[in-house]
Amino acid sequence: MAQPGKPQSVLELSRLLNIPLDDCVVPCNFCKRFLSYTELTDFDTKCLSLIWKDDFVFACCRYCCVATAAFEFENYFVESVIGWEIEQKENTPLSDIIVRCHHCLKLLNQIEKLDICGRSELFHKVRRGWKGLCRQCKQI
């Protein structure tokens, strides 16, 4: 949940603080370990939002993203649909449907969503959002 006036990405945070991105020190909201430079850039690449608690900022490390995705999938799974059925289910064009990776939480781009449809793979409804596999996690 975005907080007005607070940076939502690591890049925005580094610009606000007027420091290089690799000087940003942000702890994980779950394990409290500081994210590495690679994890900070991955966090922004996944289009995740920083978590603000009062004036303290947190992110989510790679391991906790995977653990969170697995926990949510196991505990809040609603249903699965095959490929293009997602448009009928949502009554919305695929390009307007927000889908995150059910393994790493990355926001899927249009090509990744089309790939799932073209291969007749599954989209999964978890809580109120849709999940699919991103191209990186398909390789695992």
Curated annotation (Swiss-Prot):
<dbReference type="GO" id="GO:0052170">
    <property type="term" value="P:symbiont-mediated suppression of host innate immune response"/>
</dbReference>
<dbReference type="GO" id="GO:0008270">
    <property type="term" value="F:zinc ion binding"/>
</dbReference>
<dbReference type="GO" id="GO:0052150">
    <property type="term" value="P:symbiont-mediated perturbation of host apoptosis"/>
</dbReference>
<keyword id="KW-0010">Activator</keyword>
<dbReference type="GO" id="GO:0039648">
    <property type="term" value="P:symbiont-mediated perturbation of host ubiquitin-like protein modification"/>
</dbReference>
<dbReference type="GO" id="GO:0006355">
    <property type="term" value="P:regulation of DNA-templated transcription"/>
</dbReference>
<keyword id="KW-0238">DNA-binding</keyword>
<dbReference type="GO" id="GO:0030430">
    <property type="term" value="C:host cell cytoplasm"/>
</dbReference>
<keyword id="KW-0863">Zinc-finger</keyword>
<feature type="zinc finger region">
    <location>
        <begin position="28"/>
        <end position="64"/>
    </location>
</feature>
<keyword id="KW-0945">Host-virus interaction</keyword>
<dbReference type="GO" id="GO:0006351">
    <property type="term" value="P:DNA-templated transcription"/>
</dbReference>
<feature type="zinc finger region">
    <location>
        <begin position="101"/>
        <end position="137"/>
    </location>
</feature>
<dbReference type="GO" id="GO:0003677">
    <property type="term" value="F:DNA binding"/>
</dbReference>
<dbReference type="InterPro" id="IPR038575">
    <property type="entry name" value="E6_sf"/>
</dbReference>
<protein>
    <recommendedName>
        <fullName>Protein E6</fullName>
    </recommendedName>
</protein>
<keyword id="KW-1035">Host cytoplasm</keyword>
<keyword id="KW-1119">Modulation of host cell apoptosis by virus</keyword>
<keyword id="KW-0804">Transcription</keyword>
<keyword id="KW-0862">Zinc</keyword>
<dbReference type="GO" id="GO:0042025">
    <property type="term" value="C:host cell nucleus"/>
</dbReference>
<keyword id="KW-1090">Inhibition of host innate immune response by virus</keyword>
<dbReference type="InterPro" id="IPR001334">
    <property type="entry name" value="E6"/>
</dbReference>
<keyword id="KW-0479">Metal-binding</keyword>
<keyword id="KW-0899">Viral immunoevasion</keyword>
<comment type="function">
    <text>Plays a major role in the induction and maintenance of cellular transformation. E6 associates with host UBE3A/E6-AP ubiquitin-protein ligase and modulates its activity. Protects host keratinocytes from apoptosis by mediating the degradation of host BAK1. May also inhibit host immune response.</text>
</comment>
<dbReference type="Pfam" id="PF00518">
    <property type="entry name" value="E6"/>
</dbReference>
<keyword id="KW-1048">Host nucleus</keyword>
<keyword id="KW-0244">Early protein</keyword>
<dbReference type="GO" id="GO:0039502">
    <property type="term" value="P:symbiont-mediated suppression of host type I interferon-mediated signaling pathway"/>
</dbReference>
<comment type="subunit">
    <text>Forms homodimers. Interacts with ubiquitin-protein ligase UBE3A/E6-AP; this interaction stimulates UBE3A ubiquitin activity. Interacts with host BAK1.</text>
</comment>
<keyword id="KW-0805">Transcription regulation</keyword>
<comment type="similarity">
    <text>Belongs to the papillomaviridae E6 protein family.</text>
</comment>
